Amino acid sequence: MDTLNDSLSLEQLVSVSPRRSQLTMAGIPPINNSGTSTGSALDSTAVSGAHTSLAGTDSSMDSTHGSGAATVSAGSPVGKDSGSGSTPSTDVTQDDDEMRKRRRQRRQRTHFTSQQLQELEASFARNRYPDMATREEIAAWTNLTEARVRVWFKNRRAKWRKRERNQLGEFKNGFGPHFNGLMQPFDDGLYSGYSPAYNNWAAKVPSPLTAKSFPWGLNSSGVPNVNPLSSQAMCFTPPTTIGTATTMVPSMNVGNGLNSLSSLQNPTVAPCPYASPGQPYAYREQCNSSIAALRLKAKQHSTSVASSFSYPSPVRQQTLSACQYAVDRPV
């Protein structure tokens, strides 16, 4: 019975297996009724199915790999463009760099108090170029750092040099623009006598003046050889007889007497071209006369006192008037 059942089952399998193989797979050789052919057909069917599944897997992997490669190849130009062109990320980094630079350039300004400024100005007036030790001392006095003191002195020296240059320019330009409105421009017409041609004044002098004979002589250009001050002294130096004349006539005008005496002694000599001075020592003569009067009174008082006692009276000198006493004394 067991053998019959096995044969029946094999026959059923053999009868069914060709149809299944024809339906499922193509290109399989016909199956014989023998058991060996049936087993080989089944084995070939399984192998072909496994191969088909593996081929499908490989194709899917290839398609996946191809799509990934396409994706990578499509994304690679974007990466190149991002490196070459400007993107928002690079703009942000540039803005950050600019902000950092601005923050570095911005420095905190030092606000000095009035006491600190007063101390710094006094130190600058004493020494414009302090050394390190002096700057440290000033920093200790003013409660500042040495760097702040050094920067302050540097700026103060620059300000001082600028002010000096401006003042020098104002002096060169004629007391600056605010003084130019007060000063009138030089006009040759108004000051023709003081023009550069004043050296040729002998050519402008009329002929009668040049024709006169002067005791001190003239050079080729007609200019006196003697200094005007010395010539003035020569004109007004009195001769030896003037002293006796003035003592005899004290009330006579000295200037007129000098001119008259010089004209009498030298009638051929031309008169002095300079005007005769008046009486420049009138105030001194008044002082001398008052002093002489006081001395005279003192002498009279001393003689009166001496005469009241029994002392021998000294020889009385000849009393002179105040005017004669003042004239006799050299001025």
From Swiss-Prot:
PROSITE patterns cross-referenced by the UniProt entry: HOMEOBOX_1, HOMEOBOX_2, OAR
SS bond partners: none
Known DNA-binding region: 105-164
An example Gene Ontology CC term for this record: nucleus
One example of a Gene Ontology biological process annotation: anatomical structure morphogenesis
InterPro entries registered for this protein in UniProt: HD (IPR001356), Homeobox_CS (IPR017970), Homeobox_Pitx/unc30 (IPR016233), Homeodomain-like_sf (IPR009057), OAR_dom (IPR003654)
Residue stretches of biased makeup (Basic residues): 101-110
Keyword terms: Developmental protein, DNA-binding, Homeobox, Nucleus
Region (Disordered): 25-44, 53-116
Major site of localization recorded for this protein: nucleus
Keyword Ion transport: no
Compositionally biased spans, kind Polar residues: 31-44, 53-66, 83-92
Motif extent (Nuclear localization signal): 295-299
Compartments reported by the entry: Nucleus
GO molecular function terms noted in the UniProt entry: DNA-binding transcription factor activity, RNA polymerase II-specific; RNA polymerase II cis-regulatory region sequence-specific DNA binding
Residue interval(s) of motif OAR: 289-302
CDD domains noted in UniProt: homeodomain
Family to which this protein belongs: Belongs to the paired homeobox family. Bicoid subfamily.
UniProt function note: Involved in left-right asymmetry in the developing embryo.
Record protein name field: Pituitary homeobox x
Organism whose genome encodes this protein: Branchiostoma belcheri (Amphioxus)
The gene coding this protein: Ptx
